[in-house]
């Protein structure tokens, strides 16, 4: 499974039309769900630190404009490290 396939599956299986979600929730599911953990790990590039990799994942969400749209607001939520940080909000189409 590619990273893009995993992200698309997470979106389609976890969010209903009209749901609003952030990139942190997708990253959490990608990294902690047994089904996607291997895909998450094998796509980490040695040239990227974890924050850069997570930004890369968040950017990949935007490629699925057939099923999500960016909301013009940013939200502050806990990231995978338990730290508050701003991130993109998405709406499921």
Region spans (language model):
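Phospho-regulated, low-complexity intrinsically disordered regions of nuclear gene-regulatory
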Residues: 1-14, 24, 29-93
């Amino acid at each position: 499974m590619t990273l893009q396939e995993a992200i698309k599956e997470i979106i389609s299986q976890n969010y209903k039309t009209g749901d609003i979600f952030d990139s942190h929730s997708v990253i959490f599911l990608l990294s902690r769900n047994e089904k996607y953990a291997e895909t998450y790990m094998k796509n980490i590039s040695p040239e990227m630190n974890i924050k850069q990799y997570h930004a890369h994942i968040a950017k990949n969400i935007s490629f699925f404009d057939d099923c999500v749209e960016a909301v013009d607001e940013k939200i502050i939520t806990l990231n995978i490290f338990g730290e508050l940080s701003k991130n993109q909000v998405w709406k499921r189409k």
